[in-house]
From Swiss-Prot:
It is found in: Nucleus. GO terms for molecular function: nucleic acid binding. A motif (Nuclear localization signal) lies at residues 35-51, 122-139. PROSITE patterns: R3H (PS51061). Its main location: nucleus. InterPro entries: R3H_dom, R3H_dom_sf, R3H_sperm-antigen, SPAG7. This is Sperm-associated antigen 7. The modification N-acetylalanine is found at A2. The lineage of its organism: Eukaryota, Metazoa, Chordata, Craniata, Vertebrata. The keyword Acetylation applies. Signal peptide: none annotated. Residues 46-109 form the R3H domain.
Length: 227
């Protein structure tokens, strides 16, 4: 009988020591604080969502606004705002490099931003429609000029022999032909001495010399022959 009573008493849970009681008390307090923080966080999210719903509603009713930029928010707040905007049937984007500096912009559906506008915001620039239009026109003009140049092909350089036709009415076809040959010779220096390459005379001086030679030939042809 004594052995049975001893076994029953030994199987019963011993009362907690003072150390165990303190640990359990701290655990209960910590759980209570955590629950309170969770409730506060939940309440803050609810209040934030209501505030965003109010701002989005005011934005929709304001016909003078087509877009709205919000202050930087954390990731959770941005997620809530994006959800509110989607429910309202609007468009929203987040911009900013660092997470602490990222912000949300919302747009009315009929005024959705273009790719150029979004690119400006992504680079931290303000969107200027007038400058964007000027940039677009310059780009189109440059592209048009490139296409026209490609269709025309390489530029044709007029040969030196064109001087014959240019000056034939002034000094005669024969003299103009000589001038053309002279100009052509001045361009082909590959097989002549260096001294012959340096012809510093102007075109007028060369033509005057040719005229003089022509007059000299003509005067020689007109002299009477002696028997």
């Amino acid at each position: 009988m004594a052995d049975l009573l001893g076994s029953i008493l030994s199987s019963m849970e011993k009362p907690p020591s003072l150390g165990d009681q303190e640990s359990r008390r701290k655990a209960r307090e910590q759980a209570a604080r955590l629950k309170k923080l969770q409730e506060q966080d939940k309440q803050q999210k609810v209040e934030f969502r209501k505030r965003m719903e109010k701002e989005v509603s005011d934005f929709i009713q304001d016909s003078g606004q087509v877009k709205k930029k919000f202050q930087p928010m954390n990731k959770i707040e941005r997620s809530i705002l994006h959800d509110v905007v989607e429910v309202a049937g609007l468009t929203s984007f987040s911009f900013g490099e660092d997470d602490d500096c990222r912000y949300v912009m919302i747009f009315k559906k009929e005024f959705a931003p273009s790719d150029e506008e979004l690119d400006s915001y992504r680079h931290g620039e303000e969107w200027d429609p007038q400058k964007a239009e000027e940039k677009r026109k310059l780009k189109e003009l440059a592209q048009k000029q490139e296409e026209e140049a490609a269709q025309q092909g390489p530029a044709v350089v007029s040969p030196a022999s064109d001087y014959k036709d240019k000056y034939s009415h002034l000094i005669g076809k024969g003299a103009a032909k000589d001038a053309a040959h002279m100009l052509q010779a001045n361009k082909t220096y590959g097989c002549v001495p260096v001294a012959n390459k340096r012809d510093t005379r102007s075109i007028e001086e060369a033509m005057n010399e040719i005229r003089a030679k022509k007059r000299l030939r003509q005067s020689g042809e007109e002299l009477p022959t002696t028997s």
